[in-house]
Amino acid sequence: MNLITIDFETYYDQKYSLTKISTEEYVRHDRYETIGFAYKINDERCVWVTGTNEHIQKVLDTLPWDDSLVLAHNTMFDGAILSWRYGVKPKGWLDTMSMGRALHGVDQSVSLASMAVRYAVGEKGTEVMNAVGVGREFFSPDALAKYGAYCRNDVELTYNIFQHMMLSGFPKGELKLIDLTLSMFIHPVLKLDTEALKAHLADTVAQKKAHLVSALQAVGKQDLAVKHILGDEETQAEVRKTLMSNVQFAAMLKGLDVEAPIKISPTTGKPTLALAKNDEAFKELLEHEDPRVQALCAARIGTKSTLEETRTQRFMDISKRGAFPVPLRYYAAHTGRWGGTDSVNLQNLPSRGANAGKLKKAILAPEGYVFIDADSSSIEARTLAWESGQDDLVKAFANGEDVYKIMAAAIYGTTVDKVTDGGRFVGKTTILGAGYGMGAA
């Protein structure tokens, strides 16, 4: 089995870049252009390739993909280019960025530059900073040669970092999980129901307006509710002006049984309302379980969309560009759990309330397949108990016993039938936390 380490250099500018749009949109965009790529087969000399798209395709077609694993530092990006732009499908995918999160934690930088320093394998160049807004044909021969050297260096860094990681004992089983995670994105097979999404978006917009009117009426702002219904720009501006008052907005939240969040002012050192659009507590209100609160907050910051609108519109945009790549981030949390990425979080689609299942049902299985939507009870605790050989816990699960109450009873020195809901929560936290190495303190 060969190892092909690869890195693509592509056109980008101030508005069209991975910092502005998702990987999916960037790679599928009509402005996409390959400047060049570098590849290294096993430990052979690294090669830089540039030229027309036809030339790039011709060179790629000569490489032994059928008998190779592909390695990159951000394989979601480079793999998508290989698959979507050039029809490449290797034996599997490897990714040093994913491996870095698992080895060094999600709170550490896993950029190629940081990893190169960590493993003392060299230094990442900065030539890419000179390529902003420059298409391939506008590079001078000297600049293009320097860009090629920069790209080859990235490949060498990635290859050497990978070798160090494997020598440190990175579990081979985890490599398969990384491959499966990346393959769901790089080789998409799901479709999106555009018509269902359109209908849901229209319903969501109507719901938002109704929720905001309901919220304004609930807090005694009947005049604002009427103006919002009228809907012209001048009246909308007046509604937002009122909502921008911290004192009035806090009072409105209180009218909906929600306490306005508080933060410590970095200027005065005293408590103040945390109602700025960048305050984390305020962001949480944008996802509040009460849609009236969501609508109030969205109106306050002048946004045109609630979270559900944004999600639905994003799905619609993807559906216009092709199959639906499933974006999951391997080792997204310190526990090792997967997480959402690329502006989509499939683990957090609504399952309750007015929008329950709407987006899920718009995701279509390939012909000949069906989706099974399941919420397996205590799946993590059951699996960990089985893998660790804790037979008493496995048996308790098999017998349908409430293991969280059993743990709580042991903690509080009482009987299972006397455990309160709060006590059960402590028992649940203990069992789940212990599975991730939580200590006694």
Residue ranges of predicted features:
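Function-dense linear segments that define catalytic or interfacial modules
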Residues: 327-417
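Cytochrome P450 catalytic domain signature, combining two hallmark sequence patches
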Residues: 89-91, 209, 257-265, 388-399
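Short active-site loop/helix that positions an aromatic residue
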Residues: 76-87, 101-103, 248-257, 377-391
